[in-house]
Amino acid sequence: MKSPAPSRPQKMALIPACIFLCFAALSVQAEETPVTPQPPDILLGPLFNDVQNAKLFPDQKTFADAVPNSDPLMILADYRMQQNQSGFDLRHFVNVNFTLPKEGEKYVPPEGQSLREHIDGLWPVLTRSTENTEKWDSLLPLPEPYVVPGGRFREVYYWDSYFTMLGLAESGHWDKVADMVANFAHEIDTYGHIPNGNRSYYLSRSQPPFFAMMVELLAQHEGDAALKQYLPQMQKEYAYWMDGVENLQAGQQEKRVVKLQDGTLLNRYWDDRDTPRPESWVEDIATAKSNPNRPATEIYRDLRSAAASGWDFSSRWMDNPQQLNTLRTTSIVPVDLNSLMFKMEKILARASKAAGDNAMANQYETLANARQKGIEKYLWNDQQGWYADYDLKSHKVRNQLTAAALFPLYVNAAAKDRANKMATATKTHLLQPGGLNTTSVKSGQQWDAPNGWAPLQWVATEGLQNYGQKEVAMDISWHFLTNVQHTYDREKKLVEKYDVSTTGTGGGGGEYPLQDGFGWTNGVTLKMLDLICPKEQPCDNVPATRPTVKSATTQPSTKEAQPTP
């Protein structure tokens, strides 16, 4: 193994010092946090466990979302008194003591709507308001209205919302975009971070960090005022993701931060709890029991951390793609997460400059530059020719190609030559008749083949366009839009995910039935419609023939190629 150049340790040592300065100067730790609402598995203890294990409801999320009609301690005391009595009926007890979530009314769109008209008509249908909630409700109140994904997802979700907001902006609903940014800022101020969703059982983790990009989106409409207004919350979120960095030694990890042997700082997904997820209680217990060679708490943490990634679940996190109990999310450094952290640092630099703090802007630029070098060094697989995740156990970059590999292009963190290789890999290994495959592995998990997801289609499309790869970008958009249109023509709805091995079929796999609505699919579909059709002639449905790309190979990316580590 080569010895590092004499100057390298000194150079790397600057990075932690910079972070300490950023945090100390800004005092960005979350404000005095109120008492954190307890999730239902803690509030209800053995009653929650017994109800979920009895499988009273087809979906475990149903009871997790149920609202106690009185003090949970009193309900639990009554349960302990009654449970062993002759003729005790658990379902009746639940019906008496809890208000179950109502099934949403099935939305029937007006006849003859175009795809665009259908989406525009859905925004009010998917809008919710929970300024006040019941005392023991798992639902967390938010000050402004928000748009939910749809179906079983009755709350707002973090990373879903960015792609939903792209569609809201495309529809001209900037007021709703502003409301959702305000809600997420409220969560940061209240809880110190943005939880997976606005439920008490989601508070122990976050999701892919898109808040800074949401603020940047709002700034397209409101200008730098939005960047300055939400700079404190962006700083607090950054502090959450970097929490514990000041105590890390080389080769150590703490919560969401990883410090590699040469001092490079990267991030991973993490959940603060190591118990079954309340919304998937029975499934998680079964997964842990199926692998007695691992501590159950370790499996629970990795299941929860995979949920934090948004990719729940995928062969990406597993040693054996056919066995969920081999997932080890916390020992993997994800390429998409670190691309988003790079983007967060760049936006923080821009916002600091807008606020007149050039010194702090330079500090964030230094952090972004260091992370970019880390991405190029550790998250590029030179043998395969694509970006990939880094394995903390093997100390090597992994071999699997996934749609997450397009994230460095999406945030303009990729070297030009590597972006070109990514375009080739994407077209060769991931592009299918109905869009971009999530991976090329068929595991039965929903974040694997043959499923394609709207956010990943948009990340790939935008990322490839950033580097002048307009033909491949158009192929992805065209194939996915055709899939969405064919499904809509037949079923009059948009869905959460699609089978991209064909067109006109919703995706499968995972822990629950296919959901419709659907927030992020609506948003990405609108963005893609406006991408493939000229502005002077916007299209309301997907055209019958694929549009040509004008100057597809012109205007190469202005991004300078980074030196190969």
Curated annotation (Swiss-Prot):
- Gene Ontology biological process terms from the UniProt entry: cellular hyperosmotic response; trehalose catabolic process
Here the segments flagged for biased composition (Polar residues) are: 548-565
- In this chain, substrate is annotated as bound at R152, W159, D160, N196, R205, S206, Q207, R277, P278, E279, G310, E511
UniProt-listed SUPFAM superfamilies = Six-hairpin glycosidases
Entry's Gene Ontology molecular function annotations: alpha,alpha-trehalase activity
Q: Where is this region: Disordered?
A: 538-565
Matching entries from Pfam families are given as: Trehalase
EC?
Answer: 3.2.1.28
List the GO cellular component terms.
periplasmic space
What subcellular locations does the record give?
A: Periplasm
**Which transformation does this protein catalyse, written as a reaction?**
alpha,alpha-trehalose + H2O = alpha-D-glucose + beta-D-glucose
**Endpoints of the signal sequence:** 1-30
Cite the Gene3D superfamilies for this sequence.
1.50.10.10
- The residues responsible for catalysis, as annotated, are D312 (proton donor/acceptor), E496 (proton donor/acceptor)
| Coiled-coil positions | none
UniProt keywords (A-Z) are: Glycosidase, Hydrolase, Periplasm, Signal
NCBIfam families (UniProt xref): PRK13270.1, PRK13271.1
Question: What job does this protein perform?
Answer: Provides the cells with the ability to utilize trehalose at high osmolarity by splitting it into glucose molecules that can subsequently be taken up by the phosphotransferase-mediated uptake system.
User: What is known about its subunit structure?
Assistant: Monomer.
State the similarity comment: Belongs to the glycosyl hydrolase 37 family.
Protein name from the UniProt record:
Periplasmic trehalase
To which species is this protein native?
Answer: Escherichia coli O139:H28 (strain E24377A / ETEC)
Q: What is the lineage of its organism?
A: Bacteria, Pseudomonadati, Pseudomonadota, Gammaproteobacteria, Enterobacterales
The encoding gene: treA
